[in-house]
Amino acid sequence: MIESDVYIICVPTPFKEDHNEKKVDLSYVESASKAVSKVLKKGNLVILESTVPPETTDICMNAILEKETGLKVNEDYYIAHCPERVLPGQILRELRDNDRIIGVSNDKAGKMAKELYSTIVTNGNIYITNSVTAEMCKLVENTFRDINIAIANELAKICDRLDINVLDVITMANKHPRVNILTPGTGVGGHCLAIDP
């Protein structure tokens, strides 16, 4: 890894089976954090973009950085969590146009992260908060999408039993100004939604 002022960690966070219980596998976050710790210098910013459980930025990534370097967060270096919000196939447009939420360790980290992301997010807004809020926000966004996909598919099953056209039901229900039911499909999938921690 080459030295830089800012390091962005964006690695998979799959599930692992542990005694019939699904748990998030943070080994990639841990490995990337250890790699960054080998080149981390005073004044650097480390950003975690992976979808992770709340408190991962502080308890996992930062704990490794402090242990491996002997440096202290907010004194020697800064951390942030800025979850990615892009759709495969539309990445460049969405990087530029989508709002970004950045959870930071302090005001200095917020200033540094906002300065960086402002060069990328040219048509969206940037919102600064703490890292736990940013981590939770990403999970809430994905859960909301999961639930909406599930509702559409459950409606398809119900309408099939009632021998009525689900697309007609959804089209008419969506005439309500606060209703936006999705079209039924194959269910939740892809590289992100199906494996949220």
Please tell me what each predicted stretch does.
Residues 1-197:
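Structural/interface elements that position substrates and couple domains in central-metabolism enzymes
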